[in-house]
């Protein structure tokens, strides 16, 4: 040990003690460890008694090296204290009562401390060598099957191992299929282990342990994807593990078992995969991927519900409050996904930091949400077509447009992810530019300028003193009236209670408009340098979305009357009354120009038409009929391109679930360019749901499915906050890894943990009160109830099923896996662009680049 620099030992980095490979002593140590006395004591040079080491191992219950390392990782002089205590133990001490005795060398000066560090290093080095030597000699660790085989009174031939819950369910299902198919039952033993083996070696024990103790089983897929590794070799190792696990299950039954055949097929399918997703997305790609999903039907169509129930200021306030809650959620989870940017997405991180069943339910709930969002985007594109009365929109034409819009999203998602990113970027930047232009357009029209010179509108529709007849202006609607059909909203709940309910309703409505901002986390597995990309993309995305929403809502809110019956109603049961009000012109006398006319198809009022968009209504108010028609066509483009983001999130969620062994492994299959085409194709099959828009009688049922999609998003946001809080408190207990205050910490979100608590409480309220109007007298609707709480029901069913059939449990904070994925990213070097002040032109260019 004299060759080791003693000063270097004072700054350890492995389990608090620096370990170095002693190649010069490897042969001597191995040969020394091979000597065995009759009493089991081994004499080793360096005055270390391995008999004492063995007694420490037995006392601590260290069956393998992993348990040993986990026990000593947070204690600097653990072995020194234990060894000294054992060595100084006398007969008198053994006969005395059990009291904790501490035998330590007092730390008096620098040299004493250095000696203790060196002594601890020697003990740990010997212990490591001891474990390695016993592994080479096949130290057998008997499993439950082997113990009962040797020591059961019934003997090894008659004993049948009891089944756990998972095995019982599989056994029942196996017997059912066996009876149906006429397969003879030849059961040897009920065991998941190989009955031909007496026990398992240390290596096999580690393999089995890693698949049960680690929550996120996808250790391979949790690595940094761009890390320079031999993919073929690593996949060979994974397949070898799968084959070993399969061999254990195949030994259960001599005859055929359908369930075991299915498991064998799944294991073989994993062996065929050669490629995985690749990091090709830049900041601007990820940014526009989320923006493209947000700037769609949620803002430009369903915002009409908010205006009709809460008025202009209530709508603005509700959108702002919802934005603050979601901002807290995004900033919190950004910190977690930046430190550990794994390809399993937020489902995998939720499994790791909350519970396996929680991550399972969260992942499948989000997949259901995205799966329903795709046909919702496609069908809403066809709904806008009803605006054009001179176009014959037959069922065949509608089906053709649905096919066209669906095929567009599918083809784009099957392209190389970098090409898809460029397409999404062009579409997203176009949406941002159009949104900015519409803000200026609304302000110019409000000031009295436009096609024809007209009087300025100002804040006329915000001033309750300017109300006339049945036109009730004001910051809020006069009352919280769910049954208002253009009569002025005078029969509902008035006062502060009514305004509170109106604002709360807008907050629930706006969750659909903000759905999609979480897509930056799904793309973390395909982001170039995620520790820089994800925080930047998240902050830019939400800044653009929130600021754009506020200005868009404000600018259109000053140009429309919130009581116009052409806007979508919050309660769908009054669609017929609103249609009659439109025919009579009730609530439409506020318009400055009435030259924009057209037929209205009553059958489509319940789901919204081109007339229902507040921006189209505002343009018609100023007599800009051609402009209104053109913008309605732009809205078709907005919703059609949003389908790309919906299918992307749907396919990547399915891929992540497969990576975690929570979905069939076939969904892991990727093309050579890193596209999970099996997940894309399977997810796209559900776009056929959009064809129910062809049949007008089924539109109401489709509206229920769309509401399930939007309501489920709040559950996802709630899960993101909960995952971060568990991570936050677990990180505070791990003193041996990076701290949040460290300068090298990738991203530190502000005001924690209060920010995450605020987001968790807000999102939980969204989930609980999503369907509260159903409990108001005379407004119960079974379909509306299930559309509001259907996602929550699915989440609890998934969670309970996985909890019952699996082995999921909530881990203690000190047992959470804080290393998988993080350490690989720590070892990855990214090439960063040099940053400098530059000229004014370069600064301006940099500002524009940061925004878009």
Curated annotation (Swiss-Prot):
Residues 1-285, 351-357, 422, 522-540, 645-673, 725-755, 806-852 are cytoplasmic. Keywords: Cell membrane, Membrane, Transmembrane, Transmembrane helix. Residues 30-41 have a biased composition (Polar residues). One of its GO terms (cellular component) is endoplasmic reticulum. GO terms for molecular function: amino acid transmembrane transporter activity. GO terms for biological process: amino acid transmembrane transport; response to amino acid. Pfam families: AA_permease (PF00324). The keyword Ion transport does not apply. It is found in: Cell membrane. Residues 21-41 are annotated as: Disordered. Residues 307-329, 379-400, 444-500, 562-623, 695-703, 777-784 are extracellular. It is a multi-pass membrane protein. It comes from the Eukaryota. InterPro entries: AA-permease/SLC12A_dom, Amino_acid_permease_fungi, APC_YAT. Changing residue 382 to K: In SSY1-102; constitutively active, up-regulates amino acid permease transcription in the absence of amino-acids. The chain crosses the membrane at residues 286-306, 330-350, 358-378, 401-421, 423-443, 501-521, 541-561, 624-644, 674-694, 704-724, 756-776, 785-805. Component of the plasma membrane SPS (SSY1-PTR3-SSY5) amino acid sensor complex. Interacts directly with PTR3 and SSY5. Interacts with YCK1. Amino acid sensor component of the SPS-sensor system, which regulates the expression of several amino acid-metabolizing enzymes and amino acid- and peptide-permeases in response to extracellular amino acid levels by controlling the activity of two transcription factors, STP1 and STP2. Amino-acid permease homolog that seems to interact directly with the extracellular signaling molecules, but has no amino acid transporter activity. May recruit casein kinases YCK1 and YCK2 to hyperphosphorylate and activate downstream component PTR3 in response to amino acid stimulus. Belongs to the amino acid-polyamine-organocation (APC) superfamily. This is SPS-sensor component SSY1. It comes from Saccharomyces cerevisiae (strain ATCC 204508 / S288c) (Baker's yeast). The lineage of its organism: Eukaryota, Fungi, Dikarya, Ascomycota, Saccharomycotina.
């Amino acid at each position: 040990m004299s060759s080791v620099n003693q000063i270097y030992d004072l700054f350890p980095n492995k389990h608090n003690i620096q370990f170095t490979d002693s190649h010069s002593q490897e042969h001597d140590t191995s040969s020394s460890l091979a000597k065995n006395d009759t009493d089991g004591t081994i004499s080793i040079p360096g005055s270390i008694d391995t008999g004492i080491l063995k007694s420490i191992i037995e006392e601590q219950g260290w069956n393998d090296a992993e348990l040993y390392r986990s026990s000593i990782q947070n204690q600097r002089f653990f072995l020194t204290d234990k060894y000294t205590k054992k060595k100084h133990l006398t007969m008198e001490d053994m006969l005395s009562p059990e009291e904790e005795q501490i035998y330590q060398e007092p730390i008096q000066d620098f040299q004493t401390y250095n000696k203790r560090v060196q002594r601890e290093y020697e003990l740990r080095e010997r212990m490591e060598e001891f474990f390695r030597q016993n592994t080479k000699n096949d130290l057998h660790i008997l499993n439950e099957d082997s113990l009962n085989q040797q020591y059961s009174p019934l003997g090894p031939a008659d004993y049948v191992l009891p089944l756990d819950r998972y095995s019982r369910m599989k056994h029942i299902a196996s017997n059912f299929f066996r009876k149906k198919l006429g397969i003879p039952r030849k059961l040897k033993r009920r065991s998941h282990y190989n009955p031909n083996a007496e026990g398992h070696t240390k290596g096999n024990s580690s393999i089995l342990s890693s698949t049960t103790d680690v929550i996120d089983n996808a250790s391979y897929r949790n690595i940094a994807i761009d890390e320079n590794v031999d993919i073929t070799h690593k996949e060979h190792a994974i397949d070898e593990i799968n084959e070993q696990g399969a061999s254990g299950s195949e030994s259960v039954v001599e005859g055929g078992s359908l369930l075991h055949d299915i498991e064998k097929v799944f294991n073989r399918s994993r062996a065929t995969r050669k490629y995985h997703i690749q990091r090709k997305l830049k900041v601007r790609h990820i940014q526009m991927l989320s923006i493209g999903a947000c700037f769609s039907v949620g803002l430009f169509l369903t915002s009409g519900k908010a205006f009709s129930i809460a008025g202009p200021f209530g709508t603005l306030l509700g959108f702002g409050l919802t934005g603050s809650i979601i901002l807290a959620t995004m900033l919190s989870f950004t910190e977690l996904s930046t430190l550990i940017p794994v390809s399993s997405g937020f489902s995998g991180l939720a499994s790791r930091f909350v519970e396996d069943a929680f991550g399972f339910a969260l992942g499948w709930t989000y997949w259901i949400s995205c799966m329903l969002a795709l046909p919702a985007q496609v069908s809403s594109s066809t709904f806008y077509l009803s605006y054009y009365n001179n176009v014959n929109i037959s069922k065949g034409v509608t089906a053709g447009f649905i096919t066209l819009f669906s095929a567009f999203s599918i083809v784009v998602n099957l392209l190389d992810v970098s090409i898809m990113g460029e397409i999404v970027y062009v579409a997203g930047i176009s949406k941002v530019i159009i949104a900015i232009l519409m803000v200026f357009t609304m302000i110019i029209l409000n000031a009295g300028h436009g096609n024809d010179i007209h009087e300025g509108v100002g804040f006329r529709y915000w001033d309750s003193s300017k109300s006339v007849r049945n036109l009730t202006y004001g910051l809020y609607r006069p009352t919280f009236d769910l049954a208002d059909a253009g009569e002025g909203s005078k029969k509902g709940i008035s006062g502060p209670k009514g305004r509170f309910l109106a604002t709360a309703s807008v907050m629930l409505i706006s969750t659909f408009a903000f759905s999609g901002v979480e897509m930056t986390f799904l793309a973390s597995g395909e982001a170039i340098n995620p520790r820089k990309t994800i925080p930047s993309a998240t902050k830019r995305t939400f800044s653009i979305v929130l600021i754009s929403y506020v200005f868009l809502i404000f600018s259109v809110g000053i140009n429309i009357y919130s009581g116009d019956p052409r806007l979508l109603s919050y309660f769908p049961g009054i669609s017929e009354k609103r249609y009659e009000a439109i025919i009579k012109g009730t609530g439409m006398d506020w318009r400055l120009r009435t030259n924009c006319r057209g037929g209205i198809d009553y059958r489509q009022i319940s789901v919204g038409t081109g007339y229902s968009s507040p921006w189209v209504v505002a343009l018609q108010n100023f007599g800009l009929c051609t402009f209104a028609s053109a913008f309605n066509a732009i809205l078709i483009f907005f919703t059609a391109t949003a389908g790309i983001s919906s299918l992307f999130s749907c396919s990547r969620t399915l891929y992540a679930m497969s990576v975690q062994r929570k979905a069939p492994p076939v969904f892991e299959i990727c093309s050579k360019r890193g596209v999970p085409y099996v997940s894309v194709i399977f997810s796209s099959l559900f776009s056929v749901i959009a064809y129910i828009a062809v049949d007008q009688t089924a539109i109401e049922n489709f509206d229920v499915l769309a509401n399930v999609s939007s309501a489920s998003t709040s559950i996802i946001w709630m899960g993101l906050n909960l995952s971060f809080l568990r991570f936050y408190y677990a990180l505070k207990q791990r003193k041996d890894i990076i701290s949040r205050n460290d300068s090298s910490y990738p991203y530190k979100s502000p005001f924690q943990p209060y920010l995450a608590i605020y987001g968790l409480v807000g999102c939980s309220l969204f989930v609980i009160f999503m369907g509260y109007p159903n409990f108001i007298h005379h407004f119960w609707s079974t379909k509306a109830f299930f559309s509001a709480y259907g996602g929550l029901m699915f989440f609890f069913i998934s969670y309970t099923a996985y909890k019952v059939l699996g082995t999921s449990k909530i881990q203690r904070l000190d047992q959470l896996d804080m290393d998988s994925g993080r350490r690989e990213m720590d070892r990855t070097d990214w090439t960063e662009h040099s940053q400098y002040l530059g000229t004014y032109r370069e600064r301006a260019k940099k500002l524009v680049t940061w925004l878009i």
